[in-house]
């Protein structure tokens, strides 16, 4: 049987513990210190990039202010928070001032060219030096920017449960709301410095604009996919200047898809538009729509005969008579608008939506004057 034998006098017994555990600890400390140094370096780079975006916006005529700002997000994000954020748009027509509760912008350490931001409402719109005339609010508003200030690639803006009120003296008046609104833009061809081609997509879900037009009182879904061709570059500048460039270069706005749904009404359109030297739209979209007979009365019978021409006069007289004597028979006049066809299995009408010096006409029906883009 083995027995314990004490070590001889003057000889130290071997220790069962060692300093081996210190090595991984030191490695962890070095990694943590390196990560901290890297985070602060990345934070400085991110601050420079955010400053670059702000400078680009300033050169585009949009000036931003921030009452209180802070930096955080360690260890995996760089977060920039701005409390009581503001913006001045002196080049807008008319000039306006915006103010929001706060903005939180963030950049991931591993994805420094993607900037994400959330805007906390409400956001007020005012004439310079005047009380707010409109107030916008939402449950969520997000912006994403991909690329760098010198070479932007993509921008997106998304809101949920958005509302826009006009601040009347008595009480706010709702002028727009949407369950969801989206705006996306991206560089499709060319470069930022030479002949860029820009794709723009928008969408509205369950939107309404009671004061815009009687037809816009009821909720509708709307989506567009368009392409801008004719820009010289995408250097910082106001959008009216960009549209002027497109006109001078004989460029165009290619509407690749437009879709509108409201109740039984479904309309799709595509075509190409140009700009006149005065900034008005010029061109034609081919529209195919179902349920047209239900919206004709809302367009205003008095406007139907203003287009001139025998066909327009016949349509105006027919609708005027049918509207008074037999409202249910107004659908028979729809054939005067254009070619009868089908859309998604339903009976539809194909008709041109024309723009001439900004005046929009749907078939022979005059819709109204659109504003100039510059």
What do these predicted ranges mean?
Residues 41-58:
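Alpha-helical transmembrane signal-anchor/signal-peptide segments
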Residues 86-96, 123-134, 161-176, 206-217, ...:
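Flexible, membrane-facing loop/turn or short amphipathic-helix motifs
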Residues 21-39:
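Hydrophobic membrane-insertion alpha-helices, especially the h-region
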Residues 2-25, 67-68, 243-248, 258-260, ...:
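Extended terminal
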Residues 79, 153-156, 196-201, 250-257:
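Short, hydrophobic/aromatic-rich segments at coil-to-beta transitions
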Residues 182, 200-204:
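Beta-strand-enriched cores of mature, soluble protein domains
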Residues 59-191, 258, 269:
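N-terminal beta-strand/beta-hairpin edge segment
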Residues 69-71, 100-110, 136-150, 173-193, ...:
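Extended lipid/amphipathic-ligand handling interfaces
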């Amino acid at each position: 049987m083995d027995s314990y034998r004490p070590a001889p006098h003057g000889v130290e017994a071997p220790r069962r513990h060692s300093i081996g555990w210190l090595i991984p600890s030191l490695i962890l400390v070095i990694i943590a210190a390196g990560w901290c140094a890297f985070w602060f370096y990345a934070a400085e780079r991110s601050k420079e990039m955010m400053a670059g975006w702000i400078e680009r916006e300033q050169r585009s005529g949009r000036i931003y202010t921030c009452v209180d700002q802070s930096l955080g997000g360690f260890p995996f994000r760089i977060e920039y928070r701005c409390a009581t954020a503001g913006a001045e748009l002196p080049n807008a027509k008319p000039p306006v001032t915006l103010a929001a509760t706060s903005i939180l912008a963030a950049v991931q350490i591993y994805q420094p060219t993607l900037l994400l931001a959330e805007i906390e409402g409400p956001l007020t719109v005012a004439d310079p030096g005047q009380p707010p005339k409109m107030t916008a609010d939402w449950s969520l508003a997000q912006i994403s920017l991909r690329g760098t200030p010198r070479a932007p690639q993509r921008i997106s803006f998304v809101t949920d449960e958005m509302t826009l009120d006009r601040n009347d003296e008595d009480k706010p008046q709702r002028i727009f709301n949407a369950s969801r609104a989206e705006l996306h833009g991206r560089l499709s061809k060319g470069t930022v410095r030479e002949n860029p081609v820009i794709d723009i997509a928008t969408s509205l879900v369950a939107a309404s604009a009671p004061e815009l037009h009687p037809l816009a009182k009821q909720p509708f879904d709307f989506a567009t996919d368009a392409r801008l061709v004719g820009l010289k570059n995408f250097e910082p500048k106001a959008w009216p200047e960009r549209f002027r460039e497109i006109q001078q270069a004989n460029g165009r706005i290619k509407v690749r898809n437009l879709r509108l749904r409201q109740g039984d009404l479904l309309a799709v359109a595509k075509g190409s538009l140009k700009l006149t030297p005065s900034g008005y739209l010029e061109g034609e979209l081919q529209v195919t729509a179902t349920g047209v007979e239900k919206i004709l009365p809302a367009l205003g019978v008095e406007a139907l005969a203003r287009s001139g021409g025998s066909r327009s006069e016949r349509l105006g007289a027919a609708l005027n008579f049918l509207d008074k004597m037999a409202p249910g028979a107004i659908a028979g006049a729809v054939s005067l608008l254009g070619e009868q066809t089908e859309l998604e299995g339903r009976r539809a009408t194909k008709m041109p939506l024309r723009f001439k010096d900004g005046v929009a006409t749907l078939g022979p029906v005059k819709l109204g004057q659109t504003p100039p883009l510059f």
